[in-house]
A protein has these predicted regions:
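Residue(s) in the substrate-gating loop at a strand-loop-helix junction
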Residues: 14
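Short C-terminal tail/terminal secondary-structure segment
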Residues: 19, 98, 109-122
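Active-site loop immediately N-terminal to the catalytic Tyr-X3-Lys motif
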Residues: 19-26, 48-49, 85, 103
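Active-site helix of classical SDR
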Residues: 31, 39
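Alpha-helical segment proximal to the catalytic Tyr-Lys
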Residues: 44-45, 106
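Short, flexible catalytic-loop segment of classical short-chain dehydrogenase/reductase
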Residues: 57-68
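A short C-terminal helix-loop "cap" of Rossmann-like NAD(P)-dependent dehydrogenase/epimerase domains
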Residues: 68-82
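A conserved structural motif in NAD(P)-dependent oxidoreductases
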Residues: 82-93, 104
Length: 122
């Protein structure tokens, strides 16, 4: 990436990295917060090489992991507490990653982008 003068690094954190985890413990929250610090630091080092570094912070996304970790009643409770009233879709996270990977995102670096149905607003 440095040789080409262009690159995109996209790290995955979580809403838990900015708040607390609804299903993970303190270790999960600490790890996800660490990814955010790493992202900012690496972004400051790599920007001069044309490399952007960002983090995607999903909330509850409708995945097998969520279905296997949280019971259906709690999933409904969480979804209804979000302003958008549903869990996110993996395709929505993929669309954000695709954008961050593109030339159109060349001025975005060191950012942590929430994709959580408005959960962190409340």
């Amino acid at each position: 990436m440095r040789q080409k003068g262009w690159g995109r690094i996209i790290n995955f954190s979580s809403s838990a990295g900015k708040n607390i985890s609804t299903v993970g413990g303190a270790h999960y929250t600490a790890a996800k917060a660490g990814i955010l610090g790493f992202t900012r630091h690496l972004a400051s080092e790599e920007a001069k090489y044309g490399i952007t570094v960002n983090a995607v912070c999903p909330g509850l996304i409708n995945t097998e992991m969520v279905k296997n970790t949280i019971n259906d009643d709690d999933i409904k409770k969480y979804a209804n507490s979000f302003p958008i009233k549903r869990l996110g879709k993996a395709s929505e996270v993929a669309s954000l990653v695709l954008f961050l990977s593109s030339d159109e995102a060349e001025y975005i670096t060191g950012a942590s982008l929430d994709i959580n149905g408005g959960d962190l607003m409340i």
